[in-house]
Amino acid sequence: LPPVYTDMTVLEYLKFVAELKKIPKDQRKKQILEVMNLVKITDMQNRLIKNLSKGYRQRVGLAQAVLGYPPIIILDEPTVGLDPKQIIEIRDLIKSLGKKHTVILSSHILSEVRYDYCKGTACCERHPGKLK
């Protein structure tokens, strides 16, 4: 989910999200730096979100999702509208997230659904009419 508040800088936005998620104050700075490093947006932290490319906005959305280290991360159409290079980068990020989190991915793009995110882990594919 790309960020909604595009008039904030990346850092301001992640601080806001950390507060909403009730991350303890003494852990916020550390966690924000860790997720920015993870999704490779540290060099964008002082830029307004509205001035970022679609790929970087997606990364900010991933950082937001990872903040607080939830056990499950749900991603809806994480590569829609990205160029081929950005798709590869986001896929790699999702694979790395899958090492520490359960990632639920939703996409109507067949190539995205068929992409092998699941090497060495459990993976499930279901069509909408067959979800239970």
Summary of predicted features, one role per range:
Residues 73-77:
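Catalytic Walker B motif of ABC-type/P-loop ATPase nucleotide-binding domains
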Residues 15, 19, 26-44, 95:
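Conserved ABC ATPase "signature" region
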Residues 62:
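Hydrophobic anchor residue at the start of the ABC signature
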Residues 48-52:
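Conserved ABC ATPase signature
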Residues 87-99:
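Helical segment within the ABC ATPase nucleotide-binding domain
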Residues 79-80, 110:
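Short loop immediately C-terminal to the Walker-B catalytic DE motif
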